[in-house]
Amino acid sequence: MYKVSEFSEMTGLSKETLRYYAEVKLIEPAYIDPKNNYRYYDDGSYFLALLLVKLRSFGFTIQEMISVMEDESFAHLEDLLIQKKETIRLQMVELQQKTEEIDAFLASGKELKNK
């Protein structure tokens, strides 16, 4: 069992994030000491936390992560990952278009300046 401070250090999740994730039922302590309300996490919690960190790095929202936790099937996770990948791909296309528009705008400004 790991204390919150140890678990936070191991996973890279802040104590506040762990508290919030427990609030929204994403990851709950394996044990809460009734004497002092200290929260403890176990190895299962550790692997779950690593998954949550990875999903967050992929841009998953809290709601999407809750959806993954509610439906633990790999097929569901795979579907969500494919959807997220497509969303990111579309964002990349949009960003590329914006950079091209900025380049064109800058070029037109330089042309006006040189006249």
Where on the chain are the PLM-derived regions?
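Basic helix-turn-helix/winged-helix DNA-binding cores
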Residues: 1-58, 62
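Short, charged amphipathic alpha-helical surface segments
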Residues: 53, 71-114
